[in-house]
Swiss-Prot record:
Task of the protein: P2X receptors are ATP-gated ion channels that play a role in intracellular calcium signaling. Not required for the purinergic response to extracellular nucleotides. Not essential for osmoregulation. Inward currents evoked by intracellular ATP. ATP analog beta, gamma-imido-ATP is a weak partial agonist of p2xE. Exclusively selective for ATP over other nucleotides. Insensitive to copper and P2 receptor antagonists PPADS and suramin but strongly inhibited by sodium ions. More permeable to ammonium than either sodium or potassium ions and less permeable to choline.
Statement: the UniProt record of this protein carries the keyword RNA-binding: no
Coiled-coil regions, chain positions: none
Bias type Polar residues, positions: 350-365, 377-388
Pore-forming motif as annotated region, ranges: 291-304
Gene Ontology CC: contractile vacuolar membrane
This protein's encoding gene: p2xE
Identification of the protein by name: P2X receptor E
Top-level taxon of the source organism: Eukaryota
Family stated for the protein in its record: Belongs to the P2X receptor family.
Transmembrane spans: 29-49, 313-333
């Protein structure tokens, strides 16, 4: 191979940018429209609407719940079986009722992010057969008595909700009682409940009755048709509800306004029960509480934001990249689609070479690094002038 015959200048050619001003109103208006659109997108879309100048963090937190029984205990409850009369209510069989307090209704007594409220219980008394010892493989329990009953007036039990939020990277930490809040219905619209329900009042803990929770979840009452078994009521079968606590300080342009919302969602085609064993004097004797009821799971979510200059700068830089794309589109239209595309290509793309000994242009068509003007008509290349 003869290396002297290789055109090293062509092999290692360098492409640089050449600026040509095309005096064509069609291309100018198109490019100007692109620029206006990009500016509106950056300023209005990303800055004002999407708030892309904020650095965001999903909050974490804790939830504490407690239950309280109502002070008034009504005796004329329609779902309670009384002396063999009123054996059904709304087409579903009635059961005897017991008046439990909050310590019996709530099981387990304390949970981190959920709670279970008993609405029906089957209580069984069991002992080992003939007092046998559980070390024997044939020893089993025998049920000596059983009763099935509803918990009276359980829908009027009240729930206290105490929650905290924290965004460690942003240095944000609050208790729910320090913030304004709001209750949303299943469609995300604000709703309010009558007393004793208190939700979103700054300086006061949130208190909701079980009936208030059901209403917010779209359930008319515990005596509505069950979700998993249509022959039973929700009071009889149990139910599962998700409570989303959503935090935000980006709903306005003032990030100092913190706000939270409650939204209860019903999990379809579900029921809920917990079996609680209670041992008495030894493991050979026990009570079994087969509890059905309302299970509420609390989920903390949302986004908190703070102004961050680097985030805003990155948003601007990303938007400026669209300017290059707009110029590329206009260039393609000018050099590939316009009637004068041949002349536009000639002005835009120029192939020049300068040898190492004689630093003079070798291109016979257009002098290098020298301004030139051409007049081009839209059809005959005579009207529009171009400057390099």
């Amino acid at each position: 191979m003869n290396f002297r015959n290789i055109d090293w200048d062509s092999l290692f050619s360098y492409s640089t940018i050449k600026i040509v001003r095309i005096r064509d109103k069609r291309l100018g208006i198109l490019h100007f429209a692109f620029l206006i659109g990009i500016i509106l997108y950056i300023i209005v879309g990303t800055i004002f609407l999407q708030k892309k100048y904020l650095v965001l963090e999903s909050p974490i937190g804790s939830i504490r719940t407690s239950l309280m029984a109502p002070s008034v205990k009504p005796t004329d409850l329609p779902y309670c079986l009384k002396n063999g009369t009123d054996t059904s209510y709304d087409g579903y069989p009635n059961k005897p009722c017991q008046y439990w307090d909050e310590y019996l209704v709530l099981y387990p007594p304390s949970e981190e992010s959920s709670m279970f409220i008993t609405t029906r219980c089957t209580q069984e008394t069991q002992s080992t057969v003939n007092g046998c010892n559980l070390s024997e493989p044939t020893c089993v329990y025998n049920t000596t008595s059983s009763s099935d009953f509803y918990i009276a007036n359980v829908e009027n039990f009240t729930i206290l909700l105490d929650h905290t939020l924290s965004a460690p990277s942003l240095g944000i930490q609050y208790n729910g009682a320090q913030l304004n809040g709001q209750l949303l219905d299943t469609d995300g619209n604000p709703m309010s409940l009558p007393p004793p329900n208190i939700v979103g009042v700054k300086g006061s803990p949130d208190i909701m009755s079980l009936q208030g929770v059901l209403t917010a979840a779209g359930v008319e009452s515990l005596d509505s048709q069950g979700l998993a078994n249509k022959s039973r009521t929700i009071r009889d079968d149990g139910i599962l509800i998700l409570c989303f606590i959503t935090y935000s300080n980006t709903y306005t342009y003032n990030t100092g306004n913190y706000h939270y919302t409650y939204q209860f969602k019903l999990v379809q085609n579900t029921k809920y029960k917990i079996v609680e064993p209670v041992f008495t004097k030894d493991v050979e004797d026990r009570y079994i509480f087969d509890r059905h009821g309302v299970r509420i799971i609390f989920i903390q979510t949302g986004q908190l934001g703070q102004f961050d200059f680097q985030t805003m700068l990155l948003t601007f830089v990303s938007g400026i990249g669209l300017v290059t794309a707009a110029s590329l589109i206009v260039d393609i239209i000018a050099t590939r689609i316009m009637p004068q595309r041949s002349r536009y290509q000639e002005l835009k793309f120029q192939d020049s070479s300068i040898n190492n000994t004689q630093k003079t242009p070798t291109n016979d068509h257009t002098p290098l690094l020298k301004d030139n003007e051409d007049t081009i008509n839209e059809n005959s290349y005579q009207n529009n002038s171009y400057e390099k």
